[in-house]
Design a protein with these regions (language model features):
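Short, flexible loop/turn elements at secondary-structure junctions
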Residues: 5, 43-45, 99
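Short beta-strand scaffold segments in enzyme catalytic cores
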Residues: 47-53
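ATPase catalytic-site recognition across NTP-hydrolyzing enzymes
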Residues: 1-41
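A residue-level signal for conserved active-site and pocket-lining positions in enzyme catalytic cores
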Residues: 1-2, 49, 95, 165
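Generic recognition of flexible, low-complexity loop/linker segments
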Residues: 25-28, 36-39, 49, 81-85, ...
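Acidic, Mg2+-coordinating catalytic module of metal-dependent nucleases/exonucleases
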Residues: 186-190
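Structural beta-strand/beta-sheet cores of well-ordered domains, especially the beta-sheet scaffolds
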Residues: 35-41, 45-47, 91-95, 150
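Mg2+-dependent endonuclease catalytic cores in nucleic-acid-processing enzymes, primarily RNase H-like
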Residues: 55-185
Length: 190
């Protein structure tokens, strides 16, 4: 429409309150010197990390590290490099991941958290694995303004995260008559 590219969306977006005009930064979000860095990680063969800072009660998401068909050992190196090159001004680094990443692989004794720590990254399981708690935490920030600015702002370079917010992360339509959707979001690449 109007010569603009769009995406085909199937399902019901998890975050319908996400508005590109409001939640995507117009300019690059700079690193706030002396402010802690927070990183959220999801493991698997497509590991991903979201990197941001909480500055004056606003979550500023500055970067993402998304890998395809990459193990946790290589991903840890890529993440460590991203932190060292782009975020050296941050005061502390807090890394949290899916608590399922604390279970040992059947092939050896290590867990993703052990591997991250071995790479010099202090990472810990998130306090809860509740999907509802995570969804509500993000939705609450998307619905809030702080000093006239969005409480949750994403750097435009975070393309996968933006695609997820823009409908890629969705409740799958159920194969029944009517508009019925699954109770939990579809576990896809977002």
């Amino acid at each position: 429409v109007m010569n603009r590219l769009g995406t085909i969306k199937d399902g019901k977006p998890v975050y319908p309150m996400f508005a590109s005009e409001t939640h995507i930064a117009k300019e690059e979000i700079p690193v706030a010197a002396g402010i802690p860095l927070y990183i959220g990680i999801d493991f698997g063969l497509t590991p991903a990390a979201v990197i941001g800072q909480k500055v004056r009660n606003r979550w500023l998401i500055q970067s993402e590290v998304v890998a395809f068909d990459m193990g946790i050992v290589r991903f840890a190196e890529v993440l460590r490099n991203e932190i060292a090159t782009r975020f050296s001004q941050a005061s502390d680094v807090y890394i949290y991941g899916d608590p399922a990443g604390d279970f040992r692989a059947q092939t050896d004794e290590s867990t993703p958290f052990h591997i991250l720590r071995g790479a010099g990254l202090r990472a810990f399981p998130a306090p809860s694995n509740s999907v509802d708690l995570r969804l509500e935490s993000v939705a609450q920030q998307l619905n809030k303004m702080v000093e006239g600015k969005p409480a949750f702002l994403v750097d435009r370079r975070c393309s996968q995260l933006i695609k997820g917010f823009d409908g890629g992360y969705a409740y799958k339509r159920m194969e029944v008559s009517g508009e019925r959707y699954a109770d939990k979001p579809d576990k896809n690449m977002y």
